[in-house]
Amino acid sequence: MRYTLVLIIILYSTTLLKAQEIQNFDNRFQLAQSYEQAGQLGKAEAIYRELAYAQPWNNIFFETLNKILVSQKKYTESIDLLNNKIKQTPTDFNLYGLLGSTYFIMDQSEKAFETWERGIAINPNSIVGYRVIANYALVNRAFEIAIDILKRGKKYSEDPTIFSIDLANIYAVNMKFKDAAAEFCTLIIHHPEQVQLAKARMNIYLKGHGAVEQTIEAIKDFINSKSQIEFYDLLSFVY
């Protein structure tokens, strides 16, 4: 009985200490954020470093530290931080995305693209890798690179249409409305029930110059090659 009581006390004390430690980390993180918002980046960085080293598995602490290094143009430190992390977890797509982003911000675009390709090469059959890396290219407005990555990812996907919406959005942003419409039509071929989604997404860009004409042309091309009732519905919507 006494042994059980002692064990309960020990477990309770350990749990309490752990809870206090977590609360302390949360408080420190909030303090660092306050410093950052106040423009005291050096003080914020010091706390972010402290937290990242105390909990090396915590991706939020790690990525926040990297972010503040980049915001201070401490690019070499960001690169070192990310490379060291890659050595520890070499299969993390996200790390290659972040490292490539640092190079891209430094105007070392070729090195950025090489780094993103290294990320994809971890597992070239993984659709997750293509989408993660493409997202970093998008964030950096490297649209052509993002398009290339997503199109390559389609080849390895059992359902290539999961890339169609991403591609359509990029095409629309770059005023390639015919290409955007073609991706939505591809989506509808495989998933006719998604016609309403296609309409909603198209409606976002149809006011763009030449968007209606290009979209109609794309839909008609699909009607000519594969007559499907949803395409007529879509065409009527665009008109």
Where do the model's predicted regions map?
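Canonical positions in the second alpha-helix
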Residues: E50-L51, N84-K85, R118-G119, R152-G153, ...
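Short coil turns that delineate tetratricopeptide repeat
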Residues: I22, P56, P90, P124, ...
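N-terminal leader/linker segments that initiate helical-solenoid repeat arrays
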Residues: L17-N83, T91-N94, E114
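Canonical tetratricopeptide repeat
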Residues: Q30, T64, L98, V132, ...
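Register position in tetratricopeptide repeats
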Residues: Q37-A38, S71-Q72, I105, V139-N140, ...
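TPR alpha-solenoid repeat register
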Residues: N27, F61, L95, G129, ...
